[in-house]
């Protein structure tokens, strides 16, 4: 697949067009709208919706956003003058059918399938969030731990092998997106 084909997935909002580059893979069924900045070697998989319409979305390098995930933001208001942008760091794996809304994620994070992270939540680097977890608004998850549940609870410190896996997971998806870009 030619990299130029993904431009059909990019839509402007109020004259602001998503910023992508030739190292990105964006599946033809994904939709990216408005003020969204995507760093190098990011992959956006089938049926992802990313709406940077009422605030900004930033996705760091080597990050993968898997099938069916929704990325959105919180509008600026008198109660919340800056709103809540969505900031996703580098080497992040966002599993299938997650919802990330106006939150901040550091680097080397795995967000398990079906997890929901709400407005104002801060996820520090080197965190593993289990499948189906709910991170409530304004909650901070500190670095180096496994979190699961609804609402999310800190379970235990990550093992060295699990911390290494966080980075490896993102690199696996960089390799996969490179295969897709080559048409393999």
Annotate each PLM feature.
Residues 4-44:
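N-terminal segments that cap or nucleate solenoid repeat domains
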Residues 93:
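Short HxH-centered metal-ligating active-site micro-motif
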Residues 27, 52-53:
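Thr-Gly-centered strand-to-loop micro-motif
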Residues 46-48:
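N-terminal beta-strand/beta-hairpin edge segment
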Residues 1-20, 53, 59-74, 78-86, ...:
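Glycine-rich hexapeptide-repeat left-handed beta-helix
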């Amino acid at each position: 697949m030619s990299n130029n084909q993904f431009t059909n997935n990019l839509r402007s909002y109020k004259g602001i067009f998503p910023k992508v580059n030739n190292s990105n893979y964006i599946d033809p069924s994904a939709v990216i709208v408005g003020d969204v900045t995507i760093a190098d070697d990011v992959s956006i998989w089938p049926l992802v919706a990313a709406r940077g319409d009422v605030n900004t979305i930033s996705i760091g390098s080597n990050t993968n956003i898997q099938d069916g995930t929704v990325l959105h933001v919180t509008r600026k208001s008198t109660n919340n003058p800056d709103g809540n942008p969505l900031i996703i760091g580098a080497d992040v794996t966002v599993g299938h059918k997650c919802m990330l809304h106006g939150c901040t994620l550091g680097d080397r994070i795995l967000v398990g399938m079906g997890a929901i992270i709400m407005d104002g939540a801060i996820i520090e680097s080197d965190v593993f969030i289990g499948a189906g977890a709910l991170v409530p608004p304004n909650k901070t998850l500190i670095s180096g731990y496994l979190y699961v549940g609804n609402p999310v609870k800190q379970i235990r410190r990550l093992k060295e092998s699990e911390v290494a896996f966080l980075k490896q997971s993102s690199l696996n998806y960089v390799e996969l997106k490179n295969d897709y870009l080559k048409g393999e």
